[in-house]
Structure formats: C-alpha cells, structure tokens
Amino acid sequence: LTLWDSRIIMEYLDERFPHPPLMPVYPVARGESRLYMQRIEKDWYSLMNTIQSGTAAQADAARKQLREELLAIAPVFTQKPYFLSDEFSLVDCYLAPLLWRLPVLGVELVGAGAKELKGYMTRVFERDSFLASLTEAEREMRLGRG
C-alpha cells in the first residue's frame, strides 16, 4: 500500500491503530473533522507555502493574513481545550505542524487572541506523542535554541 496525501495517511494510521481514536465515532462529527482539516489545508497551509516560496511582498502579506486568521479563531480555545473538542483529535494533529513552524515562518502571535492560541499550542506541544513525532530538524526549530 502506498499513500501520499497527508490527510489520507493520518486517517489510515488512525484506523490501523485505533486506540485511542483520533477521529470522532459519529459520522456527522467525522465529516466536520474532515471539513476542518480541508479548511486548514486550503486556507492556512497555502499561506505557509506562500511565506516559504513567494516573493518578499507575497510572503509578508501571507504572514500577516496567517497571523490574523489564527488569532481570529482563538476564542474557540476558551470553550474547549482542543480544536472544537474536549479530546485531542486528528484535527489537532493536522494543525500542530503549522503552529510549530510559526517562529520559523516569522509569524509572531501578539494581540487579541494570542493568549488563548498560545495556551492551545502549549497543550498540544507538551503531549508526549507530539514530542515523539518531531524529527531532529523540527525539534531544532523550537527546542534547539540555546
């Protein structure tokens, strides 16, 4: 079996190793999770790609837009500890790599919503499973400084 799309790989792994499940049990909630992941990819990962490969002006505009959009959703993290959920899910797994790279991308979280978003990031980044998933290069992005 050869899989190549990150979401397909993540769902396959969740089904292959189902304990604990990272996708909701109920079909409607599963569909919502898939929509959230699609939106994260379409809206935010595309901005990350522009920051990394666009012109300086395009990167600056994408950096600003990404910061504003992330801060705009921050209130959801006052209602539930994870992305619209009481439980850590595949949506959190999908969003975490982007959030981990924010300092390298030059995206600084300041202003309204920053505290809530940083609290969410801390909850995700302190999970043993997240830390175990980091490559050496990813670890250096945040942990290897100093």
Annotated model-derived regions:
Residues L1-P75, P81:
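GST-like domain detector, emphasizing the conserved glutathione-binding G-site
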Residues L3, S33, D92-C93, R127:
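Short, thiol/selenol-centered motifs that function as redox-active sites or metal-ligating centers
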Residues L13-D14, Y120, M141-L143:
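Short secondary-structure boundary/hinge segments and terminal tails
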Residues E136-G146:
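Acidic/histidine-enriched, glycine/proline-rich intrinsically disordered or flexible terminal extensions
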